[in-house]
Amino acid sequence: MSERNQQDGQFDKLTIKIASDDVIRNEWSRGEIKKPETINYRTFKPEKGGLFCEKIFGPTRDWECACGKYKKIKHKGIVCDRCGVEVTLSKVRRERMAHIDLAVPVVHIWFFKTMPSRIGNVLGMTSADLERVIYYEEYVVINPGQTDLERKQLLNDTEYREAQEKWGRDSFVAKMGGEAIRDLLASEDLQTQLVELKDKLRKTKSQQARMKLAKRLKIIESFVSSDNKPEWMIMSCVPVIPPDLRPLVPLDGGRFATSDLNDLYRRVINRNNRLKAILKLKTPDVIVRNEKRMLQEAVDALFDNGRHGHPVMGAGNRPLKSLSEMLKGKQGRFRQNLLGKRVDYSGRSVIIVGPELKFNQCGLPKLMALELFEPFIVKRLKDQGYVYTIRSAKKMIQRHAPEVWDVLEDIIKGHPVLLNRAPTLHRLGIQAFEPVLIEGKAIRIHPLVCSAFNADFDGDQMAVYVPLSIEAQLEAKLLMMAPDNIFLPSSGKPVAVPSQDMTLGLYYLMLDPLYIRENHELKTRVFRDSEEVLLALQASGSYNWYEEGSKSPNGENRSDYLRGIRIHEKIKLRTENGIIETTPGRVVFNTIVPKELGFQNYSLPKKKMGELVMQCYKKAGLEATVRFLDNLKSIGFAEATKSALSMGVCDVKIPTIKQKILHDAHERVAVVRKQYEDGIITEGERYSKTISIWTEVSDVLSEELFKLISEVKDSTMNPLYLMMDSGARGNKSQIRQLGALRGLMAKPSGDIIESPITSNFREGLSVIEFSISSHGARKGLADTALKTADSGYLTRRLVDVAQDVIITEDDCGTLNGIDVSAIKQGQEELLPLKDRIFGRTVCEDIYQPGDSTKLLAKSGDTLTVLQAEAIDDSGIESIRIRSVLTCETRRGVCAKCYGINLANSRSISMGEAVGIIAAQSIGEPGTQLTMRTFHLGGIASAGLTPEIVADDNGILVYTDLRTVKTDEGNWVALNKNGRLNIVKDEGRTLDEYKKLLSTKSIEPLQAFNVELGTKILLEEGTKVKPGTRVAEWEQHNIPIICDRPGYVRYEDLVEGLSTERDVNKQTGQAELIVKQHRGELHPQVAIYADQACEDLVGTYPLPAGAIISVEEGEFATAGKMLARLPRSAIKTKDITGGLPRVAELFEARKPKDSAEIAKIDGVVDFRGVQKNKRIVVVRDEMTGMEEEHLISHTKHLIIQRGDHVVKGQQLTDGLVIPHEILDICGVRELQKYLVNQVQEVYRLQGVDINDKHIEIIVRQMLKKVRVIDPGDTSLLYGEEVDKKEFEVENQKVSQEGGKAAQATPVLLGITKASLSTESFISAASFQDTTRVLTEAACAGKTDYLVGFKENVIMGHIIPGGTGFDRHKRVKMFVDSEQEQGLEFNFAD
């Protein structure tokens, strides 16, 4: 049902309710169907009174009744007196419905089987009990009368008969089946129930019971507040959908193809008719009951086949598609027909490269254009008087008359077309171009737009769409043309950057000088200006003639020939800024550079190219940039061709020292093997060390190889190096495999095979090496196929959760923001501050540190690149910026909190669909990530350096570091969160430095995070020089270290229970290993000051898997390793960690092996064991507050007794549970954690996504709160409501002087967040369709069509982008309705 808006015939809202029998019979239906027949198989005419009856549904032929008495349009509206058919259009058969009157009421399966069961909740009965009643197994008491039976009590046959004998037939009422349920529902008093439930809620203390009650209360409340009556969930008649929606199509050979629904309806009618017949006769009860049950099952199958019992099978043993299946899933009504419509005026063809095109053009095959623009051509042909009827125009077009081509040329001018390549992962997958007519049948596209479409020319196809209306053409022209889309919306980086051949040509042109005349005792040439250089180049005839001592082409001797100028010769050139040294090649390049950029005098790999394009856009504007890009394309292809670059097998050099290095490595591996056999190290360590040795060899050989191929000999360069260095093709790892060695490979399981492939591709692989190689290659391909689907699904969920987020106002006026700082890993800066703050709005005035007169940015400024750089250079560590996470706009977000539009570096416009842009920006690289695994062929990389080396002169200072000095004179770190700092030598004392560091008054030159067990080689306060080794750490084990000297005693190390002796097979050496156990033991090593073991110094709990390194009774010195826990063997770093990790974060799932985190600030203490778990206590010294943590033995503690921890710090290894961060540290910390964790995964892959996109998704995950105390509001305990709705409700109550409700924020995963949207249409089209619709119908929900999806489904213009203003009017109407106190609410 919908309310229409008179002026444009569009409705504003849609309400869904339960249909009562009255509505079905009197409002929807045109008549009752009594026969199961469909059509007469001889005449092919519909049977009367059957499922296709013309009397009920309307005529099968336009303006013709069934018997043929009336046959023309003039009889319109007459009902034939012979056959009873109304004379009208046959299309009414698509809209007229009928009904089937049932002999007994049946239960609608959705309301009974969709959990939580609505009927069960209203009646307060369990599903199992209901099922027994509905399917005629037991009686239920409806009215106990004077007996001592209870209402709703179940009775089986025997009990029912006994009760009748005991109290008499008419003393009580008990029934079974749908009828019984209907009577119960009708006699249910919902108002009293509500009062009772609220009363119970107030009295109960138990959480579980309260949740249960609140759930039930919500369902009953929804019935009370809507006009739905509970008994409508039981049907006494079934609606029949129009026949043309379930057609019966004759196939050749006299057979018919039919929709499954017809079979399901026939079953219902057959059973219903049989039941009616049986009821007329006096039939035994058992048979009647069975027949009634069969009717109930037939109706169930019609509505939702397979929900109850076995699904009904059709021909070929396939389950029939019921009404529910028609809606569900990818092939269902929502996703197939409403969201994924087909487009008219479209074509598709293979694409080929069109290097001659301009940036805004595409080549369109003539024949295709003729077909696509046909209506336009027809109109133009008529206007110009070539033809008079449409038919003759079409004929003219079919015979390809010459006039037609002229007309087509004319029409196409200024009429853009859209090109699209599937999969469309982000908005750059559809762009508009000016068509250029070409011969042939392939579409031509400009080489620079390929990267946006992710297209290549190995047979890709693209689709062409023609925008028809003037508005559509305008949008295409103004917003979608390729030149307007040269930056990625995800990061603001240019996407139209020359690649492959173009990069190669440009790099070749811009090479550093290869030929220096001074080396040949000649003078460097000097030129007046660029013109002169170009003239000299033209005159020199030859292009790159390098052969020493050879004859010139036309036989003159060499000295004469050298008057010619070489493209890579060093020359001097006069420019505006004085005389510079450059090469003729660079002069040629600078002829196309916009003058605003100045003279470019450096070599130009692909990375620099992107920066140059960006710079050009900022200094010279869009038009100049597009021109520049076109010129880059032309000159790049030209130079690549002229350079005649080729590559031969001999260009792949093999380092001469390869054999020696390999020999050394084999020896080192043998030493490790020997250590293992002697029992000094474990199997895991041996494996890890072997892998490390080979990784190192691989690196050393690569270095050698790159030295070798990057040499310039006789002013020529290695083409292989040229390709790699320019970024045109190939990367270091691939070239390493060609010339050095293939290196370590991974098994399909992800483990690294420890014997590497020592051959390279130039030498060729042996058979065994080939087999190992194929492992990696196959895994790559299999992964790709699987993960592409995963990634697509992630994008779909992201779009669904963020689709409603649009820019709805300019400034929400909030004072809140988030603090951002540069992202560092150890000492290197991964992402500088300027990149994180550029284009964002600052919350407060920012002054130069130490100079409060110099204002760097005013509060409310959107930072430009220059401002961002100035702030970064000034040494400010972190600044506060506005963010969508703190935006206070009621619906959508505001422009100030969002910042700039990355796609064009301008401020974001109203109505921009930033949510969808965010979802695409995160999802699109997801597919890239998944597709990127196999290029390395499963090559293993294990990165972590085992030593810390100083880079600067300075003084070594420890901070937050507990150390102990060992006998060898080193210091060992005892905790995990300490740092080593190297600070500038300013002649202060050590304590002063420490104080300055702790207050962040000085910045260390370098800061290293220190792992537990790191061996520090220098005392603090030592002066260090660059290259000094400061510390080293064991990368294969996590050590457990003794911090005070004493005698060792084992506690609870019981062999066979908590430990096992593992005899090393090679050596016979026994090792004591702590194993996982269930019991009251807590294995630890105790240290006593005396041999009698009375004076306890300290205890060290041992986690499962630890290998004990000390004997009982021996004297352990400080710093001695008591036990070691092998780090799990290194796995390859594949994105496999990536995509599932991103999904895990966005779905807010609990990670496997999660970490325990501290709930308060304080000092750590251990308190023994309880139920096989260690008790760790954190005690706040100031307040005396304590928090207990129970930690299982299998987890490794990363804190020691006496460590000071802060709230939210990890106590054990593993990943943190996001919900815990929310509970312990609050919303801000959680937001920061989620954004940083997601960014980390993408950064590892080198994918650049702006923070704001991830922030939008996180905002959507945190938009609900859970009510913990309803106060005087109408909210329920444990109910999850929108933050905004909660605030409105509280305002209302506090104005009336009542008690406000209390709530805590909840974190929802993206799937759950999408399903909990206010719009039931949007939720139903996403997932769980039946559940969403059932819930909405019970509550009589209204959808105000405010989001995108709902409007697409309804066929309205979407309320974003250019459709935004149009919906402003609707918003006014909604706001006025709200003021009148009508109840409804919006998605956030």
UniProtKB/Swiss-Prot annotation:
One of the GO BP terms on file: DNA-templated transcription
Catalytic activity: RNA(n) + a ribonucleoside 5'-triphosphate = RNA(n+1) + diphosphate
Residues annotated to bind Zn(2+) 2: 812, 887, 894, 897
Residue sites binding Zn(2+) 1 per the record: 65, 67, 80, 83
Cofactor annotation comment: Binds 1 Mg(2+) ion per subunit. Binds 2 Zn(2+) ions per subunit.
CC cofactor: Mg(2+); Zn(2+)
GO cellular component, one term: DNA-directed RNA polymerase complex
PANTHER family linked to this entry: DNA-DIRECTED RNA POLYMERASE, DNA-DIRECTED RNA POLYMERASE SUBUNIT BETA
UniProt function note: DNA-dependent RNA polymerase catalyzes the transcription of DNA into RNA using the four ribonucleoside triphosphates as substrates.
Protein name: DNA-directed RNA polymerase subunit beta'
